[in-house]
UniProtKB/Swiss-Prot annotation:
Gene3D superfamilies: Arginyl tRNA synthetase N-terminal domain, HUPs, Isoleucyl-tRNA Synthetase, Domain 1. Its EC number is 6.1.1.19. Monomer. It catalyses: tRNA(Arg) + L-arginine + ATP = L-arginyl-tRNA(Arg) + AMP + diphosphate. The gene is argS. The keyword Cell division does not apply. GO terms for biological process: arginyl-tRNA aminoacylation. GO terms for molecular function: arginine-tRNA ligase activity; ATP binding. This is Arginine--tRNA ligase.
Amino acid sequence: MRQSIEELMEHAQNTLLAEGVIPADAKLGGIKVERPKDKSHGDFSINTAMVLAKQARMKPRDLAQRLVDALPSGQGVVSRCEIAGPGFINFFVTPERLRGVVADVLQRGGSYGQGNVGAGQKVLVEFVSANPTGPMHVGHGRGAVTGDVLARILECAGYAVQREYYLNDAGVQVQVLGRSVMLRYRQLFGDAVEVAEGCYPGDYVVDIARALKEKDQDKWLEVARAEPDEYPREMLEFAMQQVLTWIKADLARLNIRFDHWFSEFSLHSEGRIEHALEVLSQKGCLYEGVLEPPKGKKSEAWASRPQLLFKATDFGDEVDRALRKSDGSYTYFAADVAYHLNKAERGFERLVNIWGADHGGYVRRVQAALGALTGKQNLLDVVLIQMVNLTRGGEPVKMSKRAGTFVTLEEVVEATSSDAVRFWFLSRGSGAQLDFDLDLAVAKNNDNPVYYVQYAHARICSIWDKAQHEGVALQAQGWSGVDLSPLGEGAEWDLIRKLDLFPDVVEGAAVHQEPHRIPYYLLDLAAAFHTFYNSHRIMDVDAGTRDARLVLILAVKQVIANGLELLGVQQPRSM
């Protein structure tokens, strides 16, 4: 319905433009159609008159009246308009148009909620990107679910989406994995070596070492004893593949897939870092220099060495950034620069990264580098994911023996379910820390949000099954012949208005990259349905009212199903 209101107001604006009431060069930015919280203010409210009043040299309320007078009649959408406050125009939608929402939902079925705000724009969503050095933890899981659901929402809103996992297979952390596995490998042959400080604890390292021994026997033993801090790349590749197998299994449990797995090592081996630096050099964005000590670091503890620096401050960053150290090695940031240039060179028009909150300090520098490399601002958006606190019985959940320092994602999924994990990880905005109650996540009561929403879907299925059992001739496929005019009570209007809101929620979640808007909406819709069900009879009423209400709740079921599908959560027929 919002689109219909926008079209009506656009017609009125064009009429006043043609009459010269609104100047031809009027700036239309800032005009918003909103849904008033107070029902007495109508179904929609628009601020056009207040935005254009000064440009039209009129009082806002006077311009509002001219706009109302210029609205086309006979559209069957608006029953009346009211001018309120300083110049808002409030629209009251006709009952017929409201009932038409139910038909629209059922006609469009699984496509209801889809839009085209993305207009086919090519978007790359990079998420998870956990180091291949150990099992995934719940923080990784929250980022995985957020990225996957955001990708689904963007697709629903008309974007052409690709999903990518950046495999950090060339950094310091994989070097630590190599040393950790090599020590455990030696222990399996009876060498009395201790796990050095800084190496990875946890039984999973022993599992990798055992698999390595089974595969290669003592092939690496001589090398390991001769060079305790060294390891062959072949051995490291094997260790990373073992971890990657676990990571892919964890993602499969959550039904998360990727279109691309991009190797950081390839940036080095294929000369992509040198290419990125050459592009920056050609644009005059590099220089040899010495950085000042970071804030809070004493100057005497800071080694000032000449490095190759990027003029990040010219592109909105706080300080210039090092790309190549004085010893000739590249910084981690250099690989980030090369990777993001590669994304742009692949033709993506918008980049979205899902990062842990601890990477927040990297956002501005990567955005600055992309701006310098491409000449485009706002190419990269970053969604930061805060921590997850696990509790059971009101107490924090202790660390995993297998991981050594944290609870693995696999353990959480096995203790609850994929549905629970996916819904709960989106039960708060990504910028807020999340408390995940493992007991509540499996509870079959209304305090468990995923159960509450799924139960609404299952309850509607049960009502329809009962109707069929009692001989009601109405079929789900035959709803179009049902007279919806009996719908008109307050709770029915509330449900219909919430159904109409769903496409706007999807669009807002896509534009603002806030996937948690979907579960928030579903909880609200489920609450409205449960309230309606508890206060209204559906079966034990006259046939006309019964059939209209059956069709109404069928539309509710469809929208709940569409929302749960966006979340990657099942839509059970019974519970």
